Amino acid sequence: MKYFEKRFLDVYRPLYIGVIFLGIILDLVTKFLVILYFEPHRYLEVLGSFFRMTLTFNTGFVFGAFQDNAIPSLIATGIAIVFLIGYRWKNYDLGNPWGWNLVMAGAFGNFLDKFFVKIPGTGFRFGFQPNVGEYIGVVDFLDFDWPDFLLFSRWPAFNVADSCVTIGLTILIFTMKLEEEK
């Protein structure tokens, strides 16, 4: 048991766990506020057309896999989280711990979001079967316009959890590359 306790504290220090929980809470609170105050597919221009807040629902997994299928998407996300925890446990000295923590926060934030039906103007309820006027899927709301050389005129909307994963992976890639060069 002592090995487990030491290993757990090496990998998941209290500060790191706090960062993970902070990321999850920030993600879920922002999603709740957007559900409460926005109508689906209506937008609020924050910085003109460059940055808008638009309530959308992503019913798939990575790159739209399992679109409109809540249970397979939930299972795939759960498997990804178990893989991340196991990989981090085995390779706890690989990469930057802050990068790992951000990836975990984002993965858990979107995973938890998949357990709820969204009711615009009201909030959430636990479940996977929406009634009329209700939605399933992960709440996305950060909507940016990028230069026209991209294949689409607007970048797909995303959320705080997606941002945590992207920033965390960027940190991990750079730190692992630096470790490799040493």
UniProtKB/Swiss-Prot annotation:
GO terms for biological process: proteolysis. It comes from the Bacteria. Its EC number is 3.4.23.36. The active site is at D140, D162. It is found in: Cell inner membrane. GO terms for cellular component: plasma membrane. Pathway: Protein modification; lipoprotein biosynthesis (signal peptide cleavage). InterPro entries: Peptidase_A8 (IPR001872). It catalyses: Release of signal peptides from bacterial membrane prolipoproteins. Hydrolyzes -Xaa-Yaa-Zaa-|-(S,diacylglyceryl)Cys-, in which Xaa is hydrophobic (preferably Leu), and Yaa (Ala or Ser) and Zaa (Gly or Ala) have small, neutral side chains. It holds the Pfam family Peptidase_A8. The keyword Cell inner membrane applies. The chain crosses the membrane at residues 15-35, 44-64, 65-85, 97-117, 155-175. Its main location: membrane. The keyword RNA-binding does not apply. Keywords: Aspartyl protease, Cell inner membrane, Cell membrane, Hydrolase, Membrane, Protease, Transmembrane, Transmembrane helix. It is a multi-pass membrane protein. GO terms for molecular function: aspartic-type endopeptidase activity. Belongs to the peptidase A8 family. This is Lipoprotein signal peptidase.
